[in-house]
């Protein structure tokens, strides 16, 4: 079963979540990460079947940043109950939450995921390193003591070991948590391999590492991974950025790249040898636990071993499950009402 076809009845756009909240406060409202979206959609559908006394939650997307922004809008019927996120909540977001009266932000880790680079299945495999990715997308690169416009148009110009294909990188836009992990673990890591950039002051370094070319070779996707996949269909030479779970469900269409000679897998992500991985989360609004029907039950159901552990439906859909010890700690913190400080 394809992730993008699962539980469509409970998936809505991020914009719709806030507008329908007043009309359906016997229904849990969720928005956020495109990476977490398919997993949350599966759980929402199964939750509705398992607990007929509660309505199936309404799951929206909008990206991690978009979901957390909605989450931190305040407390009450017109605000969402859960924000899905492919990264930890930032201090600035937590401050925004508290300013709006959301003081009980409870973090729920659900498992792990890798960020993968994949091309059309009919194309040659890529063996990428962070410096390759940075050299492909940077607006400017150091040359003879100064920064010049990126001269590279084909991958093999960067490194002869790479395919002789035109450079087109399809990456998540800034509203996605995936973008932040991609920036930190691939782009920044690649940028830092240039001695000339490391010698710059911090502001100049940041600009050099985060300013991408605007000549059509870098395409930013604000939507979910299905949109990235569609771009690869129309641009067969493109390399796209996906979550490992999405790639697992589309192996017939995609060829995954190695990073630092390591292929992404459950084993390489858990042992840390694959460098572009992250934990996945959702955040629960503690102030809503008593007023929103089923919110407590949904949270405990999601992190149960049956739902998201080894051999579960979520693992089969691509989620890398936590250890029993981690799961027990997450559940204990939730039951104790432990909020993010």
Please give the residue ranges for each predicted region.
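Flexible loop/hinge segments at secondary-structure junctions
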Residues: 23-341
């Amino acid at each position: 079963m394809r992730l993008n076809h699962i539980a469509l009845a409970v998936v809505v756009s991020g914009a719709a979540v806030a507008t329908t909240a007043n009309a359906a406060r016997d229904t849990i409202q969720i928005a956020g990460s495109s990476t977490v979206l398919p997993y949350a959609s599966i759980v929402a559908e199964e939750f509705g079947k398992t607990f007929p006394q509660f309505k199936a939650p309404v799951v929206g997307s909008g990206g991690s940043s978009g979901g957390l922004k909605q989450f931190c809008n305040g407390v009450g019927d017109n605000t969402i109950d859960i924000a899905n996120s492919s990264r930890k909540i930032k201090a600035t977001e937590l401050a925004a939450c508290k300013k709006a009266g959301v003081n009980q932000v409870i973090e729920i880790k659900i498992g792990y995921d890798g960020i993968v680079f994949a091309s059309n299945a009919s194309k040659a495999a890529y063996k990428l390193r962070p410096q390759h990715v940075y050299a492909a997308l940077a607006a400017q690169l150091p040359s003879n003591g100064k920064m010049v416009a990126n001269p590279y148009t084909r991958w093999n110009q960067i490194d002869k070991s790479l395919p002789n294909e035109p450079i087109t990188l399809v990456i998540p836009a800034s509203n996605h948590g995936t973008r932040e992990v991609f920036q930190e673990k691939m782009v920044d890591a690649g940028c830092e391999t240039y001695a000339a950039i490391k010698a710059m002051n911090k502001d100049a370094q940041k600009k050099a590492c985060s300013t991408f070319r605007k000549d059509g070779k870098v395409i930013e996707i604000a939507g979910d991974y299905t949109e990235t996949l569609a771009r690869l269909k129309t641009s067969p030479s493109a390399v796209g950025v996906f979550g490992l779970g999405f790639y697992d469900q589309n192996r017939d269409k995609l060829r995954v790249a190695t990073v630092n000679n390591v292929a992404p897998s459950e084993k390489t992500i858990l042992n840390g040898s694959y460098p572009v991985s992250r934990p996945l989360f959702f955040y629960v609004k503690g102030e809503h636990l008593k007023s929103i029907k089923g919110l407590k039950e949904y949270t405990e159901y999601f992190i149960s071993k049956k739902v998201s552990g080894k051999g579960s439906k979520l693992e089969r859909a691509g989620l890398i499950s936590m250890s029993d010890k981690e799961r027990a700690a997450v559940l204990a913190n939730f039951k104790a009402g432990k909020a993010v400080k």
